[in-house]
From Swiss-Prot:
Disulphide bonds in the chain: 172-207
Keyword Membrane: yes
Residues the entry annotates as binding Cu(2+) 2: 62-64
Region (Interaction with ADGRG6): 16-31
Protein name according to UniProt: Major prion protein
Keywords: Amyloid, Cell membrane, Copper, Disulfide bond, Glycoprotein, Golgi apparatus, GPI-anchor, Lipoprotein, Membrane, Metal-binding, Prion, Repeat, Signal, Zinc
Subcellular location: Cell membrane; Golgi apparatus
Sugar-bearing residue positions: 174, 190
Protein's organism: Plecturocebus moloch
Main location: membrane
Stored Pfam families: Prion (PF00377), Prion_bPrPp (PF11587), Prion_octapep (PF03991)
Functional description taken from the UniProt entry: Its primary physiological function is unclear. May play a role in neuronal development and synaptic plasticity. May be required for neuronal myelin sheath maintenance. May promote myelin homeostasis through acting as an agonist for ADGRG6 receptor. May play a role in iron uptake and iron homeostasis. Soluble oligomers are toxic to cultured neuroblastoma cells and induce apoptosis (in vitro). Association with GPC1 (via its heparan sulfate chains) targets PRNP to lipid rafts. Also provides Cu(2+) or Zn(2+) for the ascorbate-mediated GPC1 deaminase degradation of its heparan sulfate side chains.
Length: 241
């Protein structure tokens, strides 16, 4: 009987020591900021505000900005830049370096492009070499067999820098033959007197064609400027604006 009494008394003592289940504001509030004696489930630890377990801002478990679990910028879990998980990784938004387009590089030598190192000369469009008769069968045959060795483009300056066609053509022939001769000679090919004579005739015809083309374009540009600078056109444009 004594043993049974002692066991019963021990059970009653243990029951008194067991905590009661948490009710409203008792021993373990389910909601923050209610000051329950047992502490709530979302305590402000480390001096931070609501939801700051380590002193950061709202939703900052380790002191970073909004949505920054480890101190980085917005969307930066480990301190990198925007969209950068670790500073240098995951840079999906970084633009790729543009590649050089060789077509644009080649286009620099197209018709009308200013040639560097030639004092403002431009290189004309490629032309078909003219069919020229030199007055004897030998030279005619020689030309047909060697015409591919002669220039098919000419160097020239703008037509407004010359007082007449003859000056334009003379300058065009000299600079074109000089450049072609120097370039070809460096490749180990030499020209005879017959070659020079034929080149002069060929290049002269091409320079005349280039002058006519450039003169027509120049006068068309001038006509357009005169048209748009006339008072009626200016008045019409101002009315439309």
């Amino acid at each position: 009987m004594l043993v049974l009494f002692v066991a019963t008394w021990s059970d009653l003592g243990l029951c008194k020591k067991r905590p009661k289940p948490g009710g409203w504001n008792t021993g373990g509030s389910r909601y923050p900021g209610q000051g329950s004696p047992g502490g709530n489930r979302y305590p402000p630890q480390g001096g931070g505000s609501w939801g700051q377990p380590h002193g950061g801002g709202w939703g900052q478990p380790h002191g970073g900005g909004w949505g920054q679990p480890h101190g980085g910028g917005w969307g930066q879990p480990h301190g990198g830049g925007w969209g950068q998980g670790g500073g240098t990784h995951n840079q999906w938004n970084k633009p790729s370096k543009p590649k050089t387009n060789m077509k644009h590089v080649a286009g620099a030598a197209a018709a009308g492009a200013v040639v560097g190192g030639l004092g403002g000369y431009m290189l004309g469009s490629a032309m078909s070499r003219p069919l020229i008769h030199f007055g004897n069968d030998y030279e005619d045959r020689y030309y047909r067999e060697n015409m591919y060795r002669y220039p098919n483009q000419v160097y020239y300056r703008p037509v407004d820098q010359y007082s007449n066609q003859n000056n334009f053509v003379h300058d065009c022939v000299n600079i074109t033959i000089k450049q072609h001769t120097v370039t070809t000679t460096t490749k180990g090919e030499n020209f005879t007197e017959t070659d020079v004579k034929m080149m002069e005739r060929v290049v002269e015809q091409m320079c005349i064609t280039q002058y006519e083309k450039e003169s027509q374009a120049y006068y068309q540009r001038g006509s357009s400027m005169v048209l748009f600078s006339s008072p009626p056109v200016i008045l019409l444009i101002s009315f439309l604006i």
